[in-house]
């Protein structure tokens, strides 16, 4: 039998209206960071997407505290994965009656927080 380690909590944000490349800049910035430090960094980040990442991180912390009873002062962000979601296709008129397609990308965010063990 495989025993699962249940000292982690996750939160997901789906269909965020930002490209995965831009979201990954913020997600890689907070990866392997303490939750308290990451919340401060996201509060003062100039990136537009930082607010949504902060809300998802708060949701993961709430899941850890309420569902699993983990200590929020010892939580670290172990995973912050970004994936592609749907692509909205739009048409932009161009010269001489032509048109080109514009792709508006959406992305998914998955944040996992783990309780740091005392060593």
From Swiss-Prot:
Q: Which UniProt keywords apply?
A: Ribonucleoprotein, Ribosomal protein, RNA-binding, rRNA-binding
Residue intervals passing through the bilayer: none
The biological processes this protein is annotated with in GO are: translation
Q: A single GO molecular function, which one? A: structural constituent of ribosome
| Pfam families, per database record | Ribosomal_L22
- SUPFAM superfamilies, from UniProt? Ribosomal protein L22
- Answer yes or no on keyword Nucleotide-binding: no
Q: Which domain of life is it from?
A: Bacteria
Q: What does this protein do?
A: This protein binds specifically to 23S rRNA; its binding is stimulated by other ribosomal proteins, e.g. L4, L17, and L20. It is important during the early stages of 50S assembly. It makes multiple contacts with different domains of the 23S rRNA in the assembled 50S subunit and ribosome. The globular domain of the protein is located near the polypeptide exit tunnel on the outside of the subunit, while an extended beta-hairpin is found that lines the wall of the exit tunnel in the center of the 70S ribosome.
Oligomer and partners: Part of the 50S ribosomal subunit.
The similarity annotation says: Belongs to the universal ribosomal protein uL22 family.
Q: Which NCBIfam families match?
A: rplV_bact
Q: In its UniProt entry, what is this protein called?
A: Large ribosomal subunit protein uL22
């Amino acid at each position: 039998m495989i025993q699962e380690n249940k000292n982690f909590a996750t939160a997901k944000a789906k269909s965020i209206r930002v490209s995965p490349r831009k979201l990954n800049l913020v997600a890689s910035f907070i990866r392997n960071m303490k939750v308290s430090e990451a919340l401060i960094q996201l509060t003062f980040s100039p990136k537009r997407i930082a607010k949504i990442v902060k809300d998802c991180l708060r949701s993961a912390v709430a899941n850890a505290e309420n569902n699993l009873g983990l200590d929020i002062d010892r939580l670290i962000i172990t995973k912050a994965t970004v994936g592609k979601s749907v692509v909205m296709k739009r048409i932009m008129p161009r010269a001489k009656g032509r048109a080109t397609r514009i792709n508006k990308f959406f992305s998914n965010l998955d944040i996992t927080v783990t309780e740091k063990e005392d060593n």
